[in-house]
């Protein structure tokens, strides 16, 4: 069976960010791999451990009662369109932003909690 490479690429171009994210997760699950760039083994192992302590992920745990306000806040934070932001909020718990400094992560947490969302930092 021959692959229609051009057709697959066309479908990927038309897909939303959420659809592409779901695709990556499905591929990771199906083939038991991780979508991460390769790194040098020696120095990178120490750097990853240090970076893990210095960076935080902001996870939307629950939208709460003011879902519309939370969607607007997620749009503002991520720059996503309305449909993608709504999909992200509906898929909670969902990581909204990754690799932030502690100060930036706390600012986003306060912003989301200010509109009624439940947020955790990881």
Swiss-Prot record:
Stored CDD domains: Ribosomal_L7_L12 (cd00387)
Any GO CC annotation of this UniProt entry: cytosolic large ribosomal subunit
Alphabetical GO biological process terms: translation
UniProt GO MF annotations: mRNA binding; structural constituent of ribosome
SUPFAM superfamilies xref list: ClpS-like, Ribosomal protein L7/12, oligomerisation (N-terminal) domain
Pfam families: Ribosomal_L12, Ribosomal_L12_N
Gene3D superfamilies the UniProt entry points to: 3.30.1390.10, Single helix bin
UniProt similarity note: Belongs to the bacterial ribosomal protein bL12 family.
Complex and partners: Homodimer. Part of the ribosomal stalk of the 50S ribosomal subunit. Forms a multimeric L10(L12)X complex, where L10 forms an elongated spine to which 2 to 4 L12 dimers bind in a sequential fashion. Binds GTP-bound translation factors.
PANTHER family per UniProt: 39S RIBOSOMAL PROTEIN L12, LARGE RIBOSOMAL SUBUNIT PROTEIN BL12M
Physiological role: Forms part of the ribosomal stalk which helps the ribosome interact with GTP-bound translation factors. Is thus essential for accurate translation.
Name under which the protein is recorded: Large ribosomal subunit protein bL12
Organism: Lacticaseibacillus paracasei (strain ATCC 334 / BCRC 17002 / CCUG 31169 / CIP 107868 / KCTC 3260 / NRRL B-441) (Lactobacillus paracasei)
């Amino acid at each position: 069976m021959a692959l229609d490479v051009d057709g697959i690429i066309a479908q990927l171009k038309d897909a939303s960010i959420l659809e592409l994210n779901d695709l990556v997760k499905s591929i990771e699950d199906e083939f038991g791999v991780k979508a991460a760039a390769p790194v040098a083994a020696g120095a990178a192992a120490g750097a990853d451990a240090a970076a893990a302590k210095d960076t935080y992920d902001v996870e939307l745990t629950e939208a709460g009662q003011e879902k519309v306000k939370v969607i607007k806040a997620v749009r503002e934070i991520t720059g996503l369109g309305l449909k993608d932001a709504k999909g992200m909020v509906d898929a909670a718990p969902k990581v909204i932003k990754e690799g932030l400094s502690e100060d930036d992560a706390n600012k986003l947490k306060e912003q989301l909690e200010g509109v009624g969302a439940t947020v955790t930092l990881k």
